[in-house]
């Protein structure tokens, strides 16, 4: 299923691959608008269940029930009515949740490019969810990173569907409470 390009050139061993180099510009707002093969200095988190840091922020009132599409009295692990997308910084000492407006400033990408990244995240997560369900798993949330490749098309430059990048729950255990 073709969702977007990647920087993968070839798998050259069972545990190695060759990828195309992308330029990394760490200075906020300094990426030229016409540059190709450039890393987008943002991390996109897609949440499907209320857990982890989102749960803690919800408890502190930093995220609202309305934002998340849940009831005020929901519990940890509640399935969200629709995926909840968040953007965090990439080159700060600690990842920091930011607004879409700040994301556009930091990355100097266009709103159209950011929306295309969001679209790709949702498509990748739908694929992960389908495959995980076949194996008795629930895909709770995950994070992804991107670059802009030829013609500034969105390119996935991160692993996904791994224990490092995604959170998983056992579907049977979840169903049993």
Feature annotation, model-predicted:
Residues 109-140:
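A long amphipathic alpha-helix within ATP-dependent nucleotide-binding catalytic cores
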Residues 45, 139-143, 156:
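A structural signal for short, well-ordered beta-strand segments and their strand-loop junctions
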Residues 66-70, 107, 177:
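Short, surface-exposed linear patches
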Residues 144-177:
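Catalytic activation segment of kinase domains across protein kinase-like and atypical kinase folds
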Residues 5-9, 132-148:
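A short glycine-rich, hydrophobically flanked beta-strand micro-motif that places a catalytic Asp/Glu
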Residues 76-111:
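Residues forming anionic-ligand binding surfaces in small-molecule and nucleic-acid pockets
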Residues 39-41, 136-139, 150-154:
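Coil-to-beta-strand transition motifs
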Residues 1-89:
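Active-site loop/lid in soluble adenylation, ligation, and acyl-transfer enzymes
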């Amino acid at each position: 299923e073709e969702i977007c390009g990647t920087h993968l050139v070839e798998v050259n061993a069972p545990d190695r691959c060759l990828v195309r180099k992308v330029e990394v510009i760490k200075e906020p707002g300094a990426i030229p608008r016409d540059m190709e093969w450039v890393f987008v200095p943002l991390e996109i988190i897609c949440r499907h269940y209320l857990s982890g840091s989102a749960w803690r922020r919800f408890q502190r009132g930093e995220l609202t029930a309305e934002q998340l599409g849940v009831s005020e009295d929901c519990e940890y692990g509640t399935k969200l009515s629709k995926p909840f997308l968040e953007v965090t910084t990439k080159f700060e000492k600690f990842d920091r949740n930011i607004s879409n407006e700040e994301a556009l400033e930091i990355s100097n990408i266009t709103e159209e490019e950011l929306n295309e990244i969001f679209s790709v995240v949702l498509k990748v997560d739908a694929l992960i969810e389908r495959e995980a369900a076949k194996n008795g798993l629930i895909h709770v949330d995950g994070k992804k990173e991107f670059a802009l490749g030829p013609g500034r098309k969105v390119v996935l430059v991160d692993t996904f569907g791994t224990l490092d990048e995604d959170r998983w729950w056992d579907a049977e255990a979840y169903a049993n409470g």
